[in-house]
Amino acid sequence: MVVFGLDFGTTFSSVCAYVGEELYLFKQRDSAYIPTYVFLHSDTQEVAFGYDAEVLSNDLSVRGGFYRDLKRWIGCDEENYRDYLEKLKPHYKTELLKVAQSSKSTVKLDCYSGTVPQNATLPGLIATFVKALISTASEAFKCQCTGVICSVPANYNCLQRSFTESCVNLSGYPCVYMVNEPSAAALSACSRIKGATSPVLVYDFGGGTFDVSVISALNNTFVVRASGGDMNLGGRDIDKAFVEHLYNKAQLPVNYKIDISFLKESLSKKVSFLNFPVVSEQGVRVDVLVNVSELAEVAAPFVERTIKIVKEVYEKYCSSMRLEPNVKAKLLMVGGSSYLPGLLSRLSSIPFVDECLVLPDARAAVAGGCALYSACLRNDSPMLLVDCAAHNLSISSKYCESIVCVPAGSPIPFTGVRTVNMTGSNASAVYSAALFEGDFVKCRLNKRIFFGDVVLGNVGVTGSATRTVPLTLEINVSSVGTISFSLVGPTGVKKLIGGNAAYDFSSYQLGERVVADLHKHNSDKVKLIHALTYQPFQRKKLTDGDKALFLKRLTADYRREARKFSSYDDAVLNSSELLLGRIIPKILRGSRVEKLDV
């Protein structure tokens, strides 16, 4: 029984297990970086995820719907729905709704593409993806998953953290902890930074988000001092800009559906130039010669945005620690976009960066760190990670300015209190409480996360005589970054503010779907065609009817399908299984587990 580490990403996700003092990554199609895609079959109770979902999305003979960009909708509610529509500009229909006992809304999404019109709730889609990924990984690791340590962007607010935690729990695998993505990456790089005498900046440039954290290390203890980031800045944005560049070069109307991930990765790691076929939606094709300097030029504005955030976070860290702003720091590069051409040299040129640390596998660092964190939960663990609150938590003054109760950078779990005095009050008086998350001085610019009216009689105040009543506001930040807000009366009676939880999916019926493994399906088809065409010393031909039937998509139960063929024979099929054994599945599937060196 093992706690798995999950890096739930915007573009790609990874899952890792820490077993026997070793880290292992799960692989699909010989890759540990699995697209955060879901395909829901409409005519069966099957679900495909990752690369399998991508394959099915392009097969017009398969009935169902394809979903992607799930993480980009986390945090969308009734207060910012229009902002999300403006930023994401989805071509599919969306709508707001409240799920189960949640007090705040989330979104229901129509499928991104597919052969059958479909829609599904965001919590249901995320939970389905997590369940399919973890259950398949558990089978590959040959161990039972008892819980999940999930990574989240450092810049997530408490509502986004609560939403993510609830989605993971809905999958059936309890979310035992959440770790900021840069913090998890730092933990996976512990052997490289534990001896560092200077602070370490963890630069996490992923597919959909950018995060940076400042970490100090002493032996095997890592403390997060400051964090920041941009929820709408990542490799996807560079992809979009690069697609526009390619189509302008080819003088064709832009087709945003084209996938350029292979081109970008090739230019980032392998080649300096190559020919790329640019195809319009009408099928017009133009071959374009692309070189690495073009990608670097397109990426440059996005890289500069990340560097601006790095400087702001480091300035905040130096100010809080009362250090000179030119104190030198090391910079650890993680995330898929950290391989961009020219990025290493540009980061090395930042005045306060004296060394850039490069990991053997920057993309797997977050999942590996989450799995390693399971060791931190043991009483005998030699490692300790102290994470921090990403934003100030504050109440409002009478001038609507922020009174900070939990400062950004505070270690979590954390409890902050603030005493207020209500003059001219008695048991029937009402206190209006509100808690804000954000770093602006003016409260209205921050995110209001809790609010409610409390009758003082409900917190132990008695009598009708007016007087000054001392009250205490208590803010608790849990180890997963979720928050509770309470009002405590003068005798210690406590009242939770905010009513129902923002996101509670405990009564949501996820439904039972079976993971459709295309590799098993394909290997079964190989066994079947071998059996249908086998005869001693030569191959026999299929009849036209059997050939037409075979070319149709078969269900997962290939033994049942086999009986539809006129040339089928039970004994021959059993022989084929013995002859092909485990070789064919391994060839078609590729390796499923990879050891991760840290």
Curated annotation (Swiss-Prot):
This is Movement protein Hsp70h. GO terms for molecular function: ATP binding; ATP-dependent protein folding chaperone. GO terms for biological process: transport of virus in host, cell to cell. Homomultimer. Interacts with p20. This interaction allows the docking of the latter to the virion. The keyword Transport applies. It comes from the Viruses. Keywords: ATP-binding, Chaperone, Host cell junction, Nucleotide-binding, Transport, Viral movement protein, Virion. InterPro entries: ATPase_NBD, Heat_shock_70_CS, HSP70_peptide-bd_sf, Hsp_70_fam. It is found in: Virion; Host cell junction, Host plasmodesma. PROSITE patterns: HSP70_2, HSP70_3. Belongs to the heat shock protein 70 family. The keyword RNA-binding does not apply. Pfam families: HSP70 (PF00012).
